[in-house]
């Protein structure tokens, strides 16, 4: 539906002359990323999803900036199980994984 492209192109200096009337629309970010990696064009993606591809040189970033999408990930579980150690271990593991991620260095635009 091109929401991410609209968010991106609203930033000054990034899209004054770009039309959203044409182009392919994919059902998932992953499909767009695969198409870009294969040389079919430019795609909007999630930095977490492309970090390894950028580090390995399979995908390039056209600009060193990222635009916040307003989307996020949440870990939830029932209140009654809040104190269970296995949920705390999962939470701690996920936080450690996120902290260890090597994301591309970009300026983040709100």
List the model feature ranges, each with a label.
Residues 31:
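Short active-site alpha-helical segment characteristic of glycosyltransferases
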Residues 18-28, 66:
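Short beta-strand-to-loop elements that line the ligand-binding cleft
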Residues 47-56, 66-110:
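C-terminal effector-binding regulatory domain of bacterial HTH transcription factors
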Residues 61-63:
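A short linear hydrophobic-aromatic micro-motif
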């Amino acid at each position: 539906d091109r929401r991410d492209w609209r968010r991106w192109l609203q930033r000054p200096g990034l899209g004054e002359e770009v039309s959203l009337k044409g182009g392919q629309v994919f059902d998932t970010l992953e499909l767009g990323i695969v198409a870009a990696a294969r040389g079919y064009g430019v795609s909007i993606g999630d930095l977490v999803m492309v970090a390894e591809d950028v580090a390995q040189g399979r995908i390039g970033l056209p600009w060193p900036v990222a635009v916040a999408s307003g989307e996020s990930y949440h870990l939830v579980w029932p209140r009654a199980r809040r104190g269970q150690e296995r949920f705390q271990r999962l939470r701690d593991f996920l936080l450690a994984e996120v902290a260890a991620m090597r994301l591309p260095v970009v300026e983040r635009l709100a």
